[in-house]
Regions:
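Primarily recognizes the serine-hydrolase "nucleophile elbow" in alpha/beta-hydrolase
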Residues: 10-56
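Conserved Rossmann-like nucleotide-binding pocket used by diverse enzymes
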Residues: 39, 63, 91-93
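Acidic catalytic loop of the alpha/beta-hydrolase fold
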Residues: 66-74, 99-100
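C-terminal catalytic histidine-bearing segment of alpha/beta-hydrolase fold enzymes
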Residues: 77-80, 84-123
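Gly/Ser-rich "nucleophile elbow"/oxyanion-hole loop immediately N-terminal to the catalytic nucleophile
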Residues: 1-13
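A short beta-to-alpha transition loop/helix N-cap that caps and shapes the active-site region
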Residues: 45-50, 70, 101-103
């Protein structure tokens, strides 16, 4: 039994931007039972060839910038496809912005969180 379960603490929901999102994506791929879900803003696949994992229904929001000079939306789409292949429930959105965060990111993340968090924190 994991230490969180001993104390009745639910799995965390990761929220990351840029490299923080890459770290959260890496946790999903390396320790798939540790997170209840994730919001990944301006992310890219953290590994070239990750080992397959089971992400049965883990909700993940990926948000990309269409004009991002650092992380191309196609790269985030590859991560979205990979996570879906492993069973995650992925929503990938692209906004007409660069690498910076926008109000659209915040609004979407808040809306997604409000819909997903109650179910994710009941595990």
């Amino acid at each position: 039994m994991c230490p969180r379960a001993l104390w009745g603490i639910a799995s965390p929901i990761a929220l990351g931007y840029s490299n923080g999102a890459n770290i959260a994506a890496a946790v999903l791929l390396l320790r798939p039972t540790e997170l209840a879900g994730a919001i990944l803003l301006r992310t890219t696949p953290p590994f070239a060839h990750p080992n397959p994992v089971k992400l049965d229904g883990v909700p993940v929001l990926i948000v990309s910038g269409a004009r991002d000079p650092i992380i191309q939306p196609e790269s985030a789409a590859k991560l979205a496809s990979l996570l879906e292949r492993y069973g995650a429930a992925v929503e990938h959105r692209v906004f007409p912005v660069g690498h910076e965060l926008s109000q659209a990111d915040v609004t979407l993340a808040q809306s997604w969180w409000n819909k997903q968090a109650p179910a994710m924190t009941n595990n």
